[in-house]
């Protein structure tokens, strides 16, 4: 049976990406197949893989065809999480496709991935 494994994000700096994503999503960096060009991040509760990081020299796409949606349980929690992610190195994205009164915020990771 076919199943989705995990999303893989292209990054220019593996250690920086590991630091950001482990802190952002409470993940744990796996040593399995770890290298200068690859790192797997697992769920902290041991339930499996969560995210792959692949070293890439190509720039992040300004309007990628695939992105990650991260959810919170309330607008207040969303505001707290956005501030926390910005403090970790994420950046706000000047995105011109917000609907009136959006319930989401577009951020980029330290590599510019939206």
Q: What do these predicted regions represent?
A:
Residues 28, 52, 91-95:
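A short linear hydrophobic-aromatic micro-motif
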Residues 13-15, 63, 68-111:
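Vicinal oxygen chelate
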Residues 2, 8-50:
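Core segments of cupin and vicinal oxygen chelate
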Residues 46-48, 61-65:
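Short connector loops at helix/strand junctions that flank enzyme active sites
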């Amino acid at each position: 049976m076919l199943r989705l494994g995990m999303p893989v994000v292209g990054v220019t700096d593996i250690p920086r990406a590991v630091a950001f994503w482990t802190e952002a999503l409470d993940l744990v960096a796996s040593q399995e197949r770890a290298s200068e060009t690859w790192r797997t991040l697992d769920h902290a509760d041991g339930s499996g893989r969560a995210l792959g990081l692949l070293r890439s020299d190509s720039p992040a796409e300004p309007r990628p065809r695939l992105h990650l949606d991260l959810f919170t349980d309330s607008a207040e929690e969303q505001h707290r999480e956005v501030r926390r992610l910005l403090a970790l190195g994420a950046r706000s994205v000047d995105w011109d496709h917000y609907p009136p009164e959006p319930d989401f915020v577009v951020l980029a990771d330290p590599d510019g991935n939206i």
